[in-house]
Swiss-Prot record:
Protein name: Chlorocatechol 1,2-dioxygenase
Keyword Iron: yes
Taxonomic lineage: Bacteria, Pseudomonadati, Pseudomonadota, Gammaproteobacteria, Pseudomonadales
GO biological process, one term: catechol-containing compound metabolic process
MF-aspect GO terms: catechol 1,2-dioxygenase activity; ferric iron binding
Sequence intervals crossing the membrane: none
Cofactor note: Binds 1 Fe(3+) ion per subunit.
Metabolic or biological pathway: Aromatic compound metabolism; 3-chlorocatechol degradation
């Protein structure tokens, strides 16, 4: 028996049983729920459904235990093979969207500036799409890896992302509609910060005053993830100083034993 599985899964089952009784769920309603979950699986929306309603809660718990910059949901559009870039993310020449500069530092949780940290950056096109995922957009557009310099600094120029809808024609979108919600996410930029010997940080940041910032369908926005509206020479600037924490000794030991 797996004690952790028994603890968590058992608590979930008991909570659901209590809701079924408290809300006097009928046999017909129960069967409708079974049919709904079957449809979710058949349309391959299981991950989408869980991410929309529950992922932010997992991140909230992680943030309460962390000494790092605020973590956030990763989303489905991270790709490991993004190229290393220096100063500029590739964007289409036809883009008429606003430029964006992202800059800052990476530090340890004890304040040490970290050279050689790798920062994956990815965000939507001005059409709300993602490279390597949608419409045959090349994987080296609108995403890339940055490497911090000897002083822990990084800087990259790109274009402003836009709000976009999650898949809305399937069962997840339908459930959001039943709940009186919508399927829009606010404009945001994703980051994954990594360095050997440190815990990876996955997060995303939003824009002050942006549409849907106060009503994200995935409940992923918290106040510390909203960047102020800073304009320099007519260009929006996002300044982010990331803090990552060292791996714990027991985690390093576990990883070594797994490899062995």
């Amino acid at each position: 028996m797996d004690k952790r599985v028994a603890e968590v899964a058992g608590a979930i089952v008991e909570a659901v049983r209590k809701i079924l009784l408290d809300k006097r769920v009928t046999e017909a309603e129960y069967r409708a729920g079974v049919d709904y979950l079957t449809e979710v699986a058949q349309t391959r929306e299981t991950a989408l459904l869980l991410d929309v309603f529950l992922n932010s809660t997992i991140i909230e718990g992680k943030a309460q235990r962390s000494r790092t910059s605020a973590p956030a949901i990763q989303g489905p559009y991270f790709l490991e093979g993004a190229p290393v870039v220096e100063g500029v993310l590739k964007t289409y020449d036809t883009d008429d969207h606003k430029p964006l500069i992202i800059r800052g530092t990476v530090r340890s949780d004890t304040g040490e500036l970290l050279a050689g940290a790798v920062i994956d950056v990815w965000h939507s096109t001005p059409d709300g799409l993602y490279s390597g995922i949608h419409d045959n957009i090349p994987v080296d557009y609108y995403r890339g890896k940055l490497v911090t310099d000897s002083q822990g600094n990084y800087r990259v120029r790109t274009t402003m992302p836009v709000p976009y809808q999650i898949p809305y024609e399937g069962p997840t979108g339908r459930l959001l509609g039943h709940l009186g919600s919508h399927t829009w996410r606010p404009a945001h930029v994703h980051f994954k910060v990594r360095k050997d010997g440190f815990e990876p940080l996955t997060t995303q940041y939003y824009f002050e005053g942006g549409k849907w910032v106060d009503d994200d369908c995935c409940h992923g926005v918290t106040p510390d993830l909203i960047t102020p509206e800073t304009i320099e020479d007519g260009v929006r600037v996002m300044t982010l100083d990331f803090v990552i924490e060292r791996e714990q000794a027991e985690q390093r030991k576990s990883a070594t034993e797994t490899v062995a």
